[in-house]
Structure formats: C-alpha cells, structure tokens
C-alpha cells in the first residue's frame, strides 16, 4: 500500500480502524493511517489552511477532491468522537464538497470571514458553557 493517500482510489478504500479496534494497522512514518487522516481532517477546520490548499491548486485536483469526499466518514460514529473541534472541521469538510467554495476560498475576504465566525462561535460557546455568576 502506498503511503500517499491520493495515490490510490480513495473512494474505494475503507476508513481506517479506530483505536482500540484490535486491527493491526501499518504505520507510515510511525503513524497509523487513522492518526494521519485525523490530523489532516482536523487541519481542514482552519480557514487559513484551506486558503493554502487553494493557493497550491490542490482544491482543483480531481484526486484531491475525491480524497476530500472519502474523508466524510469522519462525520459519522465512531470517528466523529475523535475530532477535537467538530464544528468548524465538519462544516469546512462539507463546504469543500462544493466546487464554488473550493474556488472562493482563495479569497482573503472569505478566509477572514470564516476565521471571525469561528472565533465568535468559540466565544459564544464559552459564554454558554461557563456563564458568569456575578
């Protein structure tokens, strides 16, 4: 098996086994495919990283687009529970399925808007989770 996730037809691959499943996953650079894909999918929660991917023309590469489609398994159990920030991560993963978004994310204005929305959501969550007692 090649270590490059885009070197094979991602849509035909099964998601990696989650930790504790007893599966003996091969390691790539010391990490399992589960760990590598988790790290990558979590990076998609960062609008600046999405802009970087767009600037490198990856978001117009059919193999990369197929890989993004394959990664949607992270939105379902049992994988969902491993994502640290599921809100922005899964929102961006869903948006990346749309060609218009993949084209528009090159815009610094969109990146900034997504960044500010993410910060606002984090602040709102904190206020709701830890209301002041004053």
UniProtKB/Swiss-Prot annotation:
GO molecular function terms attached to this record: transcription coregulator activity
Places the protein is found: Nucleus
Main location as per UniProt: nucleus
Domain of life: Eukaryota
Amino acid composition bias (Polar residues), ranges on this chain: 1-12
Chain segments carrying region Disordered: 1-28
GO biological process per UniProt: regulation of transcription by RNA polymerase II
Gene Ontology CC terms, in alphabetical order: core mediator complex; mediator complex
One Pfam assignment: Med31
UniProt KW keywords: Activator, Nucleus, Transcription, Transcription regulation
PANTHER family: MEDIATOR OF RNA POLYMERASE II TRANSCRIPTION SUBUNIT 31
Subunit: Component of the Mediator complex.
Its job: Component of the Mediator complex, a coactivator involved in the regulated transcription of nearly all RNA polymerase II-dependent genes. Mediator functions as a bridge to convey information from gene-specific regulatory proteins to the basal RNA polymerase II transcription machinery. Mediator is recruited to promoters by direct interactions with regulatory proteins and serves as a scaffold for the assembly of a functional preinitiation complex with RNA polymerase II and the general transcription factors.
Family, as annotated: Belongs to the Mediator complex subunit 31 family.
Name of this chain's protein: Mediator of RNA polymerase II transcription subunit 31
Native organism: Neurospora crassa (strain ATCC 24698 / 74-OR23-1A / CBS 708.71 / DSM 1257 / FGSC 987)
Gene that this sequence comes from: soh1
